From Swiss-Prot:
Any GO CC annotation of this UniProt entry: cytoplasm
Domain of life the protein comes from: Bacteria
GO MF: peptide-methionine (R)-S-oxide reductase activity; zinc ion binding
Lineage: Bacteria, Pseudomonadati, Pseudomonadota, Betaproteobacteria, Burkholderiales
The protein's required cofactors: Zn(2+)
InterPro entries (UniProt xref): Met_Sox_Rdtase_MsrB, Met_Sox_Rdtase_MsrB_dom, Mss4-like_sf
Protein name (record): Peptide methionine sulfoxide reductase MsrB
Amino acid sequence: MSAKIQKTDAEWKALLTEKGAEPVAFNVTRHAATERPFTGKYEDNYAEGTYRCICCDAELFDSSTKFDAGCGWPSFSQEVKEGAIEEHVDKAHGMTRTETVCANCGAHLGHVFPDGPTPTGLRYCMNSASLDFKPR
């Protein structure tokens, strides 16, 4: 499935700049870069609210599913609703992982691993730079 929202790199850069996104946000969301562990602004955020895509504002995660995985990136046990996130096989860096992207705009979010808490057993390991937090 292809993203519903499509823009040029210049348009994404302008949008992220206008939103005041972190400088690394463009490379993370549009070129699948990864922010350094323990550096993201949401890694230690446990306020109640919703995490949205920094590029298109689509709801991705509810704070009630966030947990401390000790990995250095914000981790969630499930997406806010089925279909909010798409998964793709990622064979970069000599390993096979499952990449997660925003289903609405294709922004790279991070990866999902099968080592999370019950009931899903999943750990959505996200880049803070790809998220925007909206408190309740």
